[in-house]
A protein has these predicted regions:
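PAPS-dependent sulfotransferase catalytic domain
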Residues: 1-169
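Phosphate-binding beta-loop-alpha motif at adenosine-nucleotide cofactor sites
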Residues: 6, 165-195
Length: 195
């Protein structure tokens, strides 16, 4: 099952991936940057190509989001997957994901004033231009190699969309567990074991 590592761009997702990679995929907790890709990115063109989706047809990619996630889940293991996508129906009809395709989510929040500075540098634009980008719905690349366009939304919409993915909804969904972290470092419970 998928555990989403979701965030608005430049909010620390790669840092959290590095922590999780050190804990779950590296020997003795020492980060090996080659293993950072143990946590993949969604949407990513390689996985869509693998399952026969025309990556040059945006509608085909969108229509296959949930199907691809269900195919990923056939691996029958817990997988962390990074995304900057907002959790909504794109164009009102293409869901990013659903409760059946996801075990849970970790949403990484960074003060948007700090995001502006970092994102402006990343985009090579002024902080004012970045602020304008962040308050509009937009799509962009995750910044990873071979990533498809991601429907990011505004900073507020991105944050609120993931905030609305409720613990109670998942808990009631077919008896599967949904794990919610209240405070960083204080877990209610965890399905993960260190390798």
């Amino acid at each position: 099952m998928i555990v989403w590592l979701a965030s608005y761009p430049k909010s620390g997702n790669t840092f959290v991936r590095a922590l999780l990679t050190s804990y779950f995929f590296c020997n003795n907790g020492i980060l090996d940057f080659k293993l950072l890709n143990s946590i993949s990115v969604f949407p990513q063109e390689l996985i869509f190509k693998k399952f026969g989706v025309d990556i040059y047809n945006e509608r085909e990619v969108l229509k296959n989001y949930v199907r691809i996630q269900k195919l990923i889940n056939k691996q029958n293991s817990i997988q962390f997957i990074k995304t900057h996508s907002a959790l909504f129906n794109i164009e009102g009809k293409y869901p990013f994901t659903n409760l059946d395709a996801s075990l849970g989510a970790i949403y990484i929040v960074r003060d948007p004033r700090n995001v502006i500075t970092s994102y402006a540098h990343h985009l090579s634009v002024s902080p004012k231009e970045t602020k304008d980008i962040m308050i509009k719905n937009h799509k962009g690349s995750s910044g990873e190699n071979n990533s498809l366009f991601t429907y990011i939304g505004s900073w507020g919409d991105n944050f609120n969309s993931w905030k609305s993915f409720k613990y109670q909804q998942k808990k009631a969904s077919k008896g599967r567990a949904w794990y919610k972290t209240k405070v960083v470092g204080k877990k209610e419970s965890s399905p993960f074991k260190r390798q």
